């Protein structure tokens, strides 16, 4: 008996240790082996006694007792009868929880098809039998017969026969001469009769013979599914069910409510329908009912089973009593409320509470204020145990009473319990890992949680009613992790970019800014102070002001770290600030001897962290916070109406622009410019005016004014707030005191009339109305984008969740080359910022001296970056996640520095999830920030290039002509102007637009800011290369060209119209030709005629017979009017790039280098071919829709990768033509562009990690002698494994090309079916996995969370490692023992005990 009691506390089912999970189709035998009995009746429970009916859906005989250790009739009660089966009610006496584990089954009277294998596309049954889904459904739902065995008749196997045809055939051929069946039995027979090996061989032969691409694809698909069945051990006929499993009753509960009603799971209703129909069918079959009735019943049974498995997948949705669709088994798994996402990936947490947050400026960085009431509730178990240990209570009940009465000793104990016990604070939405941090609680009165101001940025919290949740880590390990990994003091840097995230904001910044202002001419200027006491005395006595320029003897450290004093010129405020700076050689007084804006403060914190370590940084942050708050309060900065200074020159600028706009209107009326050009010019003029007014306003607001005594007066408050970075921006100041400027319509177009007033002057009614567009659009956008951004983050996390650092170094020699990113001549991302914290892929050498700055394989730190910058290195090869050669995960060297710690990355760091959060988090931030600048339009169309460096001009691919107006014009598209140092180093390169006016020539020496070229941003020209007379070809009135009169001006302009849509215009090829004096078409220098093809919407600029010179404009194509760009263009753009979608009007890229030739047109497409330079290559042809403007002419030379038709390139094309490195560079730059526009910093490596995950698959081009199928996509790892196997067997290996998958697709095709199923399309993923008998190796994070294990990252990774080592040791010991056991000495005499091997 005692043993029994002991066993009670042992878990009955031992937790199995497993490393993989396999899924396959359940055979009828398997289903029966799970089952504890057949369910024969649809009854559930007896409504009077509430006891389950026998053989019903809740039967206790099958599923187990309802109460622990008690049979149904009550004959056997208590533990002592454990395991006995009651002879009266046949219930086993055991724990009631077996009702959660035991399954039953329903024996079907007729087989039914499993709807998942039938309807989830592509239909598996259909593919195997090579039949269409429509035909299958006709057979299954009893409309058509199918011929199984034609015998000697003219019928074909698998031919469908309708009822009449079947009867006719029976009459014609006799009843037994052929076999035809109907319903699931027929399909089952067909599946049973399949000879998979034969089909496999046959398909391979057919694939080798076929030329059609579509047929090849179709055969490959079928072959794949045949192979799946061959190798997985599944049998095709198992897709037809003869037995339906019934899940345990406690997983589909029936709960009596008061008033005699019941709450029940929908599954019970669905099961009842199946049982009812099945029983009715059995009865009808026993009664030998007419065929038509039985057939109808069978069809209804099929439908009932369909609804049970997946309600609504076929036919109408079955609804319950309240017209609500019933939740079937598939719905239990699917979607946000399904099993996967609701219960397995996220669980409710015990020991948590939530409350409103308020600011706690007197807290230290590692503390948070916890209301006493809350702490008492959260730490109850700890308090109970402490009360017990101290002997204050003997039972839990007593302890409970003490706590409820809130006795004084309870509070003392609470203090003890809470001491150094960290708690986790979380603010929803948790967009990145800094949304949950650990703090040490400090007990406070009141009911609100107090939060430290410096961590608000990480939580994105403010105190306007935000709430936060508190969680208590219970176990010692959890407390340790909270303290070591999650403590707010350990999260000083942002994981996305390595910048400090514990940065003062708002009041603190304002206070520090005020503290560090220096003003000339204040009383006491030039006084010298020796120590702090003296200075403070002078301040209190008002002899000097905080901002007075003084001299002070400062304690400095020399290079050896020895203290010495030196005299510095500074202000009293900055001395006070200097007192909190940690003493270090690397942090001289100059670090803070300047005006402290938010950016400066951030850089100081960064330096302190780098040079003095974490502890000093935390202390420093707390001190400057206190200093900032104190000085903001002392300064008492506020602003009044007069602080908004409207510039005097405002109206002058407005009037000038008004006249300009009138001029453009007039030009338009005279027909000199089109409506679109007028619109663009007007909008341009007004945005320039707005900028100018804003400049003037800034000049006046920030101007230093002197008062009567010659001292500088106080700085303007508004300017102080904006300039310090505390609140507001120049854009907002412009709206307050400049002019509001242009507004956008909801469609994104800009309204031509600007808002001239500002908020100080007040808006007129019309202006106010115009500005409501922007504000409303902002709010609507915000609501929509939050959801979009969350979804983007979810997809990113899903695709990258199994990316973990698993080794230190993979030893690869591959890498990617990094250069500074220069956009329109300005450096947007310096080389240093891009390679900081990355590993050098090869030695970085000084270009002048050739000495090594950084060795290959070393991490580049700040000092190395400085050296690289000094040496003028332009390009560095670095290791990257993209080129890492590890099979699982990424190596530390390829990843580089852990941005959140500033040290090399640790083993087990989940870099994939960090990357996903770093990219996703600002998405939400940005979308939430659209409405801060009320839709004020910002257009930046760039139309000039100015030099940022001085040097000599070198022009590559030079082709310049002097046109009729005596301007130099760029005549080619690939002309590049480079600015070169005297020592030959390229400082900058600029690609020149076609048709741009050149302001420099080869060999010129230019200064900084010199204009290199300019062009019209609103149209693209077609230029002539030769001098001659104009003639038109195929430019026929109303067929290919139309004179349009502008309604408002009455001036005609000639536009090329779409000639294909006019009658008789299909074969036209509109062009302008240039003829010589003899009337013949001139030849061009590069070969070909001087014939310029025109595209739709080209506006002609010349007439027949006009004389032109090289570089003159023949026609122009206007570009679209400018739309406002904000992150709305941004977020969808990022999603589009990550999803690797083909852009709407994708660019066409040259696959080879060669010469352009125009071929014969095909239907309504232009044919262009490239004659390759390399004679080995084949020529490539492209068909281009005629409306598209092709800016190349016959005979132009293109390089591989050049654009033939402008547009956004499709990422797949870049990968195919230029390779992985170019693709990565393109994606990284494009995505960074969007974030840069918003001023968000994200490290490139995060994007690289995601792109690596998108490149996991290979498309097989040649299958060699392997089992792979050409054209199929297969995992890189699997591809390599199969090739290694083939090479070992001496067979020809397969070849493949890398494929780029969008993140959704990549997530659904991961090696783990658990991860894919819990992401999207659960049914499809599980169906496919089951057919293939897939094994989930449980390598990623999601799969392990789902099966309830520690994740293989972070501390979980080290646990796994330890476990692995232990298992290895165990194995070695066991092997050793076995060895010793085999060498037993010969049997000794009886008397002696046997010599045993020594115990290990």
Swiss-Prot record:
GO terms for molecular function: DNA binding; DNA-directed RNA polymerase activity; magnesium ion binding; zinc ion binding. InterPro entries: DNA-dir_RpoC_beta_prime, DNA-dir_RpoC_beta_prime_bact, RNA_pol_asu, RNA_pol_N, RNA_pol_Rpb1_1, RNA_pol_Rpb1_3, RNA_pol_Rpb1_3_sf, RNA_pol_Rpb1_4. Zn(2+) 1 binds at residues 71, 73, 86, 89. It catalyses: RNA(n) + a ribonucleoside 5'-triphosphate = RNA(n+1) + diphosphate. Binds 1 Mg(2+) ion per subunit. Keywords: DNA-directed RNA polymerase, Magnesium, Metal-binding, Nucleotidyltransferase, Transcription, Transferase, Zinc. Its EC number is 2.7.7.6. Zn(2+) 2 binds at residues 810, 884, 891, 894. GO terms for cellular component: DNA-directed RNA polymerase complex. Mg(2+) binds at residues 462, 464, 466. CDD domains: RNAP_beta'_C (cd02655), RNAP_beta'_N (cd01609). Residues 1378-1400 are annotated as: Disordered. GO terms for biological process: DNA-templated transcription. Its cofactor is Mg(2+); Zn(2+). SMART domains: RPOLA_N (SM00663). Belongs to the RNA polymerase beta' chain family. The RNAP catalytic core consists of 2 alpha, 1 beta, 1 beta' and 1 omega subunit. When a sigma factor is associated with the core the holoenzyme is formed, which can initiate transcription. DNA-dependent RNA polymerase catalyzes the transcription of DNA into RNA using the four ribonucleoside triphosphates as substrates. This is DNA-directed RNA polymerase subunit beta'. The gene is rpoC.
